[in-house]
Regions:
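Hydrophobic beta-strand-centered segment that forms part of the acyl-chain substrate-binding groove
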Residues: 48-57, 61-108
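Catalytic strand-loop segment that frames the active site of acyl-thioester-processing enzymes
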Residues: 1-57
Length: 109
C-alpha cells in the first residue's frame, strides 16, 4: 500500500490492514509480558469448563496485534509521531488460538 498522510485521507475511507492468525506463542508471550496468566487464557482444563469451552486470547493482545497490522500496512509510513488513541474499538467476539483476525480502519473525521 502506498504511504498516505493526513491530507491524503477522505472521511469514509476504509483501509484493509490485513490478517493475522493468533497462535499459542502469541498467548504465552503476552502472558509473560503482562503477567496476565488468568486461567481462561492459560489453563486448558479450566477453560473447557467455561461457557467458551476452550482457551481465549487476551483482549488487549488482540488490540495490540491489530495495531501491529496497521503499522505494517504502510499507512502513514513513519509519519506517526504519537499514538493518540482509538475511538469506538469493538471486540465483537471471543478470539481463540488458531483464529484469524482481519483488521480494517475507517477514517471518521
Amino acid at each position: 500500500m502506498a504511504t498516505k498522510f493526513g491530507d491524503d485521507f477522505t472521511v469514509g475511507d476504509v483501509l484493509d490492514a490485513g490478517r493475522i492468525t493468533v497462535t499459542e506463542t502469541h498467548v504465552v508471550n503476552w502472558a509473560g509480558l503482562t503477567g496476565d496468566f488468568y486461567p481462561l487464557h492459560m489453563d486448558k482444563e479450566y477453560a473447557a469448563q467455561t461457557r467458551f469451552g476452550e482457551r481465549l486470547a487476551h483482549g488487549p493482545m488482540i488490540f495490540a496485534l491489530a495495531v501491529g497490522r496497521v503499522a505494517l500496512s504502510g499507512v502513514g509510513g513513519d509519519a506517526a509521531i504519537a499514538w493518540l488513541g482509538a475511538d469506538n474499538l469493538q471486540m465483537i467476539a471471543p478470539v481463540r488460538i488458531g483464529d484469524t483476525i482481519s483488521v480494517t480502519v475507517e477514517v471518521r473525521e
